[in-house]
Amino acid sequence: MRLFLFSGIGVLLQVKGLMRSYFSLLLCITAFYVSPVQAISDCSTGNNDQEVYTCAQKNRNETELDLNKEYKLAKARVQTLFKDENKELSQYMDALTEAQRAWLKYRENDCKLASYAADKGSDLSSSYSNMCASELNEQRIKKLKLIPYH
């Protein structure tokens, strides 16, 4: 009977540990969906080129702010997670910084490609580039919310 009781307690503790893990996962997922990121406007509904240009510029500015904010939050989460492990913290922060710089370069080149068909320097070219950047910024924000990966 005692062996059964102890093994039952062990199973109960394991279940509680699993529940704690699942609860932590649920909190992370909930935070991801509840986070106040503004939805970008649909600029294709503009009545003329100037409206589309203004809308695309506004969206880009907003998503840039959100991107910078989320990057700072990701860095803060990493610092909190690795606060007692200086070497790991330094390596993670270096990797995060390197990844962000590489992503920014990717975004720049991808959006250059997206606006390639329009005349360089035109409002249309800028609109395509801004819409591309806004879309990629939103994707990156979602990815940054998952950092640190564990």
What does each of the following model-derived ranges do?
Residues 24-26:
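Sec-dependent N-terminal signal peptides
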Residues 8-10, 17:
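Residue-identity detector for glycine
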Residues 2-3, 16-22:
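Positively charged n-region of N-terminal signal peptides that target proteins for export
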